[in-house]
Amino acid sequence: MALLLVGGAARLALGARLDVVPGLGVTLGLGAAAVAVPVSIVFALGGDATHAVVGVLVVAAVAWLSSGLVTVRRERGAAALWRWVRRAVAATPLDALAAAVVLAATVPLLWHGLTYWTTFSNDFPSYAASVEVWAAGPQGGAAFLERHPDGFGEYQHWRAHTAKPMATALLLLASMVTGLPGAQLLAPATVVLLFLLVSTMLAVTAVVAPGRRWPVALATTAPLLSVVPLGRVYDAQLGQAAAAALLAVVLALLAGSGPPARPWVAASAVAVVLAAAVGMNPTLVVGSSVAVAGACVYVWGRRRRASGALDLRTVVLGVIGAVVLSLPFLGDYLGLGVAEADGTGGYELPFPSPAALVGLQRTVDDVISPWAWTVVVLVVAGYVLYKRKHPGPWWAAVAAGAAAANLALLVHVYGLQSYSVHKYVALAVVVVVPLLLARAVGLLSAVTRLADAVAVVVALGAANAWVAATQVPVVVPDDLWALAGDRRVEQVPVLNVHVSNAYEAPVAATVLGNERIVVTQLTYAPSHPPVGDWALIHRDWWDLGPLDEVIDLNETYQLVRFGLTEVSEGERLVLDAAHPEHERLLYGRWNRSTRGELWGAGEQTWLAFALPDQLVGREVRLTLEGELDLEDGDRLRAEANGQPVDVTAPGSSGEGRIVVTVPADATRRDGDRLTVRLFPDRDGARIGVRVETLEVRGSSG
């Protein structure tokens, strides 16, 4: 309702200055952009994002009230007020089709309730953590770091200030309106964004594609049911879904009309929506800019002769305005672009089949069949023959050519099966393909029973989407949400999260209300050594050390009081693939190479274990045999239980021994625990450590 309030106010404010195409999705999109941009800018400039949300809602309410008063003065009666509401909401019969498409694609997921689900990625908990930072006010970052004194906290604090600000703003709005934590809002956010996308694309093709309405509408929905773009939805990629939806709203604005004497109104609307789309997922939108530009040219070309159609000057002004609105985030966007420039982010995915263009690819992993490419060649040939008999601008060729050129560029840089290419294809399938398919079906509308054939394709696509939604492998159980507010858990001042599941760990760290929370397992952030004596675990799953007390919380989780694994004096631990149990001593970002070598990498790396009683209060030497890799000129530093200690190493790089000498006062600072941190002497530098063996001895041993 909040997006409808703001979006309706935007339509009322634009009024006669810009005739925006009707559609409930377009209204919601205007609302999303009108919230995301100012709220994000306020946060970026050091203001209170929650106050900005309230301010936007108040302005929207005032706009509704003032417009309503004007309507009542001009036209009396309930009928006039009803027309006024309908004009602001702008719903159409096509929105019913959009709702049906959304339900077909999401009902199996909605059945899980207000929880977190995903296929492979773990991004959504980061959005939820960003909402926690934003909701805490201008000093919320410091409070968040105090509550999360670990790698998870550092990573999420960085992300809240740098990554996808517009998506965070939308989720913050939803959290404030519903009173629910951001981590529980995946399902409603997904439904709204997917409806926004489908409804808006239906509104656009209804204007730019000729022919009978329902065959054109069905043709529009076929690509939107493809498992390739829906795979991004099922992967809980909120930013990608929002970016695609708002790019569709940009097309809707270009399909509208306005007085030529006031291009700044339309340009301002384009600027706000385009800036919001970029802020939802900067690398996706910028990386797809050639295809998006082609789609915009197509819509503009199809509408250029309509009365009051927007001219190129308006579009250019809108793009310039979007750049200006993005200036507060420009450094962050560039940083994200540099970080993802090598294309190594994400995981490899098979290149989609052409069947995905009409929703007929059954799964994301389908192997491409030769017949699919044959159909593509025949379609292109048919288009060329049509244009030879019907001369005119080749707008469809511009859109398709731009999308193909964009694809070729990304494949050249990243490879055919890269994650970057796959998410681009997902965007192109929902932004470019519906335009072309709707145009083709519109031109063929005289063909007998064409609507029936298109309906069959859509039904098959809906079936594929339904099956894919039922196969999402990761669903956070309701038992986790039940722990929020559980006094047995929240009375523990410092809680370690060690639930064995990297998807559940960041959710638990976000929704639980303990004074301090430490994530002791690797997520997108490095793991951190345990702090304190209590941990949340999966029932009967534990690998860090002896248990002193076990409290059953529910069927899935336990609260345990624990100690760390003890390393005896003189015991030589071998950290090879044959002894995985020894890896429980290592924290940070450790991975085993293809040769079986165990490497720790990042800005720091940790070891944590328990000392035997005879070594507590004595000076000890920790010896690591392996290899050190530092940047030229950097030196290795070490801390033990938070205290700087002496360390010797084989220069800045090379094989040999790393010896950490821990004084007696450090070994008694934390009971029998010894937590050692290795890091470079230069801030921001990175360290690589390969460990073969570990040994602890007293100073006289």
Regions found by a protein language model. Give the residues of each.
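Hydrophobic/aromatic-rich transmembrane helices and adjacent perimembrane loops
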Residues: N122-P125, E132, Q240, V286, ...
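Membrane-embedded, hydrophobic transmembrane alpha-helices
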Residues: M1-V89
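Alpha-helical transmembrane segments at the extracellular/periplasmic loop-to-helix junctions
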Residues: M1-L5, V323, F329-G331, G345-W394, ...
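Membrane-embedded helix bundles of polyisoprenyl
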Residues: T27-V39, A100-T106, A189-G258, P263-A295, ...
